[in-house]
């Protein structure tokens, strides 16, 4: 029997183990036992995953998830609050995804929780994309990010797994009630942690349940004091949650709560395991709140008074009570009492503490828990011990006192002889045993009794009291200024239970009370109209009256109404049409007037209808019985009475009512004489569900800047294309009236058709509105805020205002904000202070807001290319459901500080420089571009179209199977590029691995200028792994080469823009042709299969099948990953794939050839196609996708002038797109000064095209025709770009609107606050002069000149008058330090500048001085302090801050001084308005003065040669006042032009024709170091003696050596310092800049390689090339007394010349058509053009070139050089005193040099023979280039050796080569070899060079090369030693 019972117990244990709760992570045995005890015997089983940080809290989460799945198992629709992907995935398994929804937030903690979803989404295709979007914080149909109380998904059941914790702003009980009302939810099952400490508000550390909780008090005022609960895992507050303690405790305290939504909330605690609680939240229909009474004894708790707090009441950190386990506490008390009684000795405090520690553990006997773990904080143990000890002492004292009183009674009884003998004995025993000090006992006892009752065996918490019910909001004094702070903190609190909950019902009842009055008014109006003969209107009113007669309001409480509101022109009506376009029942639009009805009726289709207000009542009531409308839209609802909306609801009860209106426009007006006083719509607007619009597309920016508009709409944003519109007219000026003009006036009614007043054009728009205000009735009408609002917001183009009142009452009323009492009540400290604006009128045409910058930026803004966007963009993709709020991004998601300064133009915020490491923004861009629905065509339809497309491509492009040699060359070239990027051949082995197919998505650092109204997404790069791209790179290169060989097909990607322009222009001039430009960039919905199959068809000729399969697989499906998320992409294109350009070009060109008929030739590049031919027309029926393409996505330019990539095409000429170039220039941000300088060089190179008169004329004509502007505007842009490209770094502030980095100096804080700063600022405040009076600077000029007359001439400073009424900057005299005097700035000796004249800065504040960082390489002069106010620092997230102040400026239109002509004649003259403090204003006009550098005047007695020219002088117009005058006097420069030349360093001595510096002798150099004329040292300073260099001579020498790449042992004969000269780009060597000899150096990041001599690898800085002539022995050779130049060349690039060898500036860059960044030219795949890569050397200096291996190559002396312009004169400006020598250099892949003993002419021969075998090539005779020609009798070169290159990518031996001798005999030791099929140059190598000749010798080369390629196609390792280097 015993065995059987044991067996049964074993089986029972096994069954229980099988039925145990399975965890997914590992848990210890102790943790499982605690969980089993907590959940009352429930078995748990450990998992296999790694445990989480807080295991016990994780167990609670798993239990809650499993329990909630039981509730959603059989319901049709599931809504989860705070969803997890696991729960949603489980819900989707049993129902459609559309029936599952989750509401969450997108704050930081939620992003952290959802972060891993982006990486795990790929294994669940059903919800993977939605989960990835959730990780990025983007809403979808499955997940929303606005919270439970802001969503409308309908579901009767909802679940919440630990997601209802309040954070102070959401998830309170009232928020949950609001969410239940919106979602239609009746039941919510929720699990929460509700610790009992929420009732006691005491800190606790519970080790048994694994949590810790702390409470902190917040709130400054008594009415706002709250407690926040900090909840975390046990003793781990690193990841704690912060909740509102009072709201959190409300789930425990309340069982029923009234809500204002027509129902109450009932809260039922269904289960409670420790603190883990399950709630059931349901709707209730009975009112009244229910609270809970908690006896703490039932919870097993006891409150023990803290004796430390009693003895030290001022100890604030001490708690008043210690809440602990009652059973454990009583056990300790029993032990202490027993110990005292047994021993008779007092127990010590240490013994009590020790015993408490022994009771902390749990006691388990026979599997039964007898005592639980005692959860008590460490700091509470001693407090508890003290309290227990004190309690026992008090109890003993009480006992002793009782015995003492008994003794006294015994004694008195003994005296009376009434006690028996035994009692007498007891009395004697008491007397013997106890000696009690009665006074001491009394004091102790009284001290304890004075305290509160300190033992609460059954403490009752009454939730009705104020102390335990702080969830009821306390309302503070409303009119007190400080109380508003508390009121804001309480704005989301739960309303009081005593507050009336029927406010909405009362509002509707009040509206319905007017029904009878409204109906009677309609009856009277109907009779009146019938008597007047207007039968139609009378019938309409009678029908509306009948509907009103049937309307009753019994039982009507709240009516569900939507209210859409926003500023004028925000698109409310426009948004309603697409929103309700697909409804089956149709929409009824209600309009206030017939005019608006007719306008709406044009775009409404059946079954929707448009009616006026009264007719709509009859129509809605009539159709409600048959086919009711789904939605009724009441436009301009503010113009209706409130009862009208209720009537419409009763007329069609099933229809959804949406009201559109604006509370700040004109409301309901009663035109009858009855004065019915109907309630306005505003009384029910507060009870409607409101949707707000804050973007206006109609109102221009200057209207938004008006104080009256700012007050009414403080958050409004304008996307209007019109920047300025308000014009103020005088009486003498009038405006020509057109049919688009309206007159708003009373006295003009008889003269206007139709007559209108200010309120009548509401809801209408016109182009021009002429607004007169002069009569008394007009002023009375327009002084009302709502009427003014309507009058100012009806126009779209211009608003002319003429104020004919005597005192000018209208303009001040516009500049004054309206009274707050007129429309709403707001606390005092919330009022907005208007910006102070000083109005300056000129010629009666100036107004308060008509001010903007006149210059290149303004022209681009007028053309719509640049837009002021206020830094806000709306991000919305198709995945965002219509029921959710849009996600608004401010353009800069990361809130951290900038890591580097930014340089940009201040007027524009439409573009930004983004951080490529910004993970959040990268993920937003990723999902925004790829998370869109793709309606791709089927493969069957695609195959039909592919046949047509490929047939046309065969006719135009000679595609042929690739030859093995071509494949070998392309593959070797690709391998070389991969090796340069750090990859090797072994990487191909991981070709099919997950790592090899990984695609990383990064954000582009420089975003393009985009139109903000089109809401385009950002730009990113999809970086494919290089080992994946290597597979198809060779075949892509072959396809591109074959496309480039076609005569009729122009592949623009393989050549520069200039070459493409020349070819297209020549083709068009052959004969008259039609031409069209097509862009298919946005055509990405149906062409996926077509483009894939077209590219696969081309690759099928020679490409292996597995590579084609790989391409199709990657094109159809792939995963793009960013750092914090990934997106699965299907079919859409990637910008980073190696095949993107070729694939797009093939598809676009083939598609156009198949669709168009009559094409003669075609040019294509990517998505852009240019077609030309006779009778061009589109035949869409030729392709199945043609009709859809032509109707929707194809952008065809059919005008006479079209744009194609970066230029403009017309029949006359093909020119550059100046507007496009200017947009990229002025809309670009620059991250550092170096990039800015390189970009300027690129712009200067582009501007060379504009120097030809014909090219300039045709460019102006083409651009003006294309963009619809004038030629003057285009000429102005060309001049501005030319000036931009030639401005020095030190003169950047002369560019239009440019902002440069500034460095604020230290300044005392008293400048900004305190009396000192105010007094100092008051001294600088100066009054503006009246017209004709001298201003403060003129007065200063006079005083300065008067004082200067008393000083010496050398210290005098002449102030030159300026045409704008101010003073020019001083003209410096020799020997006088330079001083800057700028506009509005007064420099002081203490480093501060006063008298600021900057917009956005308070004039009372002084500003610190600034020191501008000069150009790199120039040492800053410490005595030269620049206090220019024209420059400020730009950052990405706080880009509008003015340095040195706390103010921000939205825009700052700085002066335009670098242009060659005034922009005012080409644009309309602007109005001068000076804003002193404006945070969000428009542009100000800073053109008056302040930015002019001083003129370099030739002094008397100096020859012209004394001022050497470093560049051509330019005539620059300096903008002055419009009348070109100064103080009413005409200046000598009356034309507004002065001659400005470039500033020279002050330490250059002026000689005759050259700039010379003194020589300095360096220690240890062995000779003098001569600095050539006009050159600088590496520090940027002239080469003076050592005393001129404070850093010392040795430091300069070391830096000099580092920059020249010269070792310590190389300091000797003539060194040439390398110069980085991106300006040449292989175009013109003469433009190398200032310097005697410039050697273009290689990349600065030169890698360290092994060679014989040590190299110094310091980065070369940009500077002028210097030649150092020395006489010294080196490497054991004596230099025969002549100077020489040594050049080190980097082997990685294999070239001598500029960085851009093979990549000219005029070639296209990777950024579409953007000017190339000269310093970042990395495109080495383009074949080298002729005549590029020149080596310069001085006259008469032999040059020797040494490679990395130490081989010295003598090139001989370089003399007698000519170029295409003839012999250079000695006084050349660019190379003064020197000639230049050009060495033709071809690019190859390795720079190994050898000696050639035979006589060879200098240069590299062109070996392009395609013949095979041993056919000899011609002799090497001469190098013939356009830059220089060298004959056979070149003197000293004949006896020297020339460098001949050996390329590393040798493919095949062509045959022997002959030398340049007389007999032309072949040299058997020399072999001609070619690389890349002869594209990049050829070379020779010697047979004795064993490293090269072993593998590639004569007959072996061809066989080994072919064998190597075949082996490589099977396995990379099989090539063995024959693998290419």
From Swiss-Prot:
- The enzyme's E.C. designation: 2.1.1.-, 2.7.7.48, 3.6.4.13
Question: Where does the (+)RNA virus helicase C-terminal domain lie?
Answer: 694-834
User: Where along the chain is composition biased (Low complexity)?
Assistant: 1626-1636
Q: Where is this region: Disordered?
A: 737-760, 1310-1445, 1468-1636, 1666-1727, 1806-1847, 1905-1925
Q: Which GO terms describe its biological process?
A: DNA-templated transcription; mRNA modification; RNA processing
Q: Where is the (+)RNA virus helicase ATP-binding domain?
A: 533-693
Q: Name one GO molecular function term.
A: mRNA methyltransferase activity
What protein name does the entry list?
Answer: Methyltransferase/helicase/RNA-directed RNA polymerase
The species this protein was found in: Nudaurelia capensis beta virus (isolate Pine emperor moth/South Africa)
